[in-house]
């Protein structure tokens, strides 16, 4: 096993990086038979070591983990999240596992950090030191990111009641290393995370930009002898897409909110005020609420914006993203079958019910005006932007989709493996200017955002409500109320009556914030983890909507049970991989697994 892990350190050839404009960011590493000492002589070889850490970024694509929650089911019987939600989740059958890749990523980072100062980055000594600083900053940021994802998937209480994280490893590991080490406490892991963030922030620019004057050079680098040309050579716009200070701050916001949440707060050493402050640092850099993208809620559908993205550039809504590529993969998987799709991800009635009516009231509130006989009328505009409901239009020809019982291949449960199981199809993430007809089979550009500013706004709202109350601001200029108001207004909900009512109670505002998060970040891999950190119920049955006609031809809407959720209480925390426990006796498993 030690030999296998040691080999990770030397697989530095030919990188297939999942980065924006990856070909411009890294040169392929030299053949690995040169030996690791070659790092000192060849900068591209050294870059290959760090590049191998980049290839292990867990947020490179959407996992559609919503299928494991109350928000969606899949019509694919082999879907791992569907099987997990049905009771097959074990420590050796774990779709949520991040141990292997994130631990390997940290190993690459540690090796890189141990050699970075000796690498011949440039002939010019000032440029060489600048390169070393930037590369170290990236590596520290990457190690912090990997720690966050490891804690999200594997932290938990052991049988003795201690909240544990993962082993904190900050030095290179080799054939003679002792891999049989215990897990650190969760709080120790968070301290290591924050330390890496601080180290990264001391070295990285907020954004990679080309500067024009010495006034823009940080004092630390000016003392090294940096000038405008050297700064642009090392920290210029061509490095967009790599780890920068704004990304590090965003992960600090994510991790702090995670640690302050009910599932971890008792032994994390992090509180909601810290989480609010860290989120605000990110948001203040874009002007706070005034920097919110008015079209951010439909980032995936802004076709002209996506098509025009150049290498390394980001839309206003997106802080960090994956590479832009031309394909029709999401549409092939999720368009309704009448449009040559597989209809894989089916939003649930539970999710549809989360959308308020146009006046902002929940559908369960009599003041909402919700009509169960016409359930999709007068609703939050985000509903039909994110979900294909009965009668919705999809694709280049605005084809009407009928999900009624017996209405054709798009009808509920008509064709096993291609028709919807809930009466709904996914619309969010999909471009509507794609034609899957085999005679056409058109493709369009897509990308996966790794961090959206909307997430950070929602992080702030959640933490600020808990720390300061609905309208409290702490040391900042905006409140949880202000953020949620802006998010709802940009989606078209401009009646603030219900929002104002929620602002009278921290509990009511918490409920509203969580619901807005559920809607805004839907199908982007959040809810599975949010439910767990909140210690919210996990076993709500996934429901659908059967639509039939009465004798007069009027539609009759009948909610139906679709799929059970079989989770045990210990499943608020994910397991340590069973294979690791077999090899290392010092590792303790989380309780219940």
What spans do the regions from the language model cover?
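Membrane-proximal, proline-rich intrinsically disordered regions
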Residues: 22-68, 103, 119, 356-377, ...
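Short, surface-exposed recognition loops and adjoining beta-strand edges that mediate ligand/DNA contacts
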Residues: 63-76, 155-170, 206-247, 261-345, ...
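Extended amphipathic alpha-helical segments enriched in small hydrophobics
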Residues: 143-144, 252-254, 445-494
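Flexible, polar/acidic helix-loop-strand segments at domain edges
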Residues: 370-453
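Sec-dependent bacterial lipoprotein signal peptides
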Residues: 1-20
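Long, intrinsically disordered, low-complexity segments
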Residues: 102-105, 177, 186-187, 192-194, ...
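Conserved, well-structured interaction surfaces
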Residues: 42-48, 55, 79-156, 174-210, ...
